[in-house]
């Protein structure tokens, strides 16, 4: 009986494997599975951000927020929730500095940012239950060219 239940559960789990797909309608309207993103998208990555063994979607959007009225690059993270649906895991206003780009790398988000004084940094962030937590600077207080070299490693 236990083997039968396990095999049924395993088959059900495998048949409902979720993938995240970004579809562009035009420059400022995208859909992540069923989730409407009425903003320009500058980056799309997938990977297991929260460590639960399932693929998450990281979408870079350009928009203002309630807490930061200046249009800027933001990071949104989504989880597949069944039947092809996407649900937001984190809709970030800001990481550390002004976000220019990000990459998913070894279970972490690597960011390319500028500070308030115009210097460039590359930083790693990890999932912290709700949102991203700073882990370390890869390089900080540098110029754009050097930061991009570190970011692209």
Cite the ranges covered by each PLM segment:
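Short, low-complexity, intrinsically disordered N-terminal peptides in bacterial proteins
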Residues: 1-3, 153
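Sec-dependent N-terminal signal peptides
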Residues: 3-14
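Beta-propeller-forming repeat regions
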Residues: 15-153
């Amino acid at each position: 009986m236990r083997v039968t239940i396990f095999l049924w559960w395993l088959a059900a789990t495998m048949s409902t494997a979720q993938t995240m797909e970004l579809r562009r309608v035009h420059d400022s309207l995208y859909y992540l599975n069923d989730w409407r993103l009425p903003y320009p998208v500058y980056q799309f990555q997938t990977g297991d951000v929260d460590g639960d063994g399932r693929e998450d979607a990281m979408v870079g959007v350009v928009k203002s927020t309630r807490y930061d009225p200046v249009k800027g690059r933001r990071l949104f993270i989504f989880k597949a929730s069944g039947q092809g649906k996407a649900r937001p895991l984190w809709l970030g206003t800001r990481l550390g500095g002004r976000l220019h780009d990000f990459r998913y790398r070894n279970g972490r988000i690597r960011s390319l940012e500028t500070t308030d004084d115009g210097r460039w940094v590359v930083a790693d962030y990890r999932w912290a239950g709700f949102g991203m937590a700073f882990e370390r600077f890869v390089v900080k207080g540098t110029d754009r060219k050097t930061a991009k070299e570190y970011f692209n490693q």
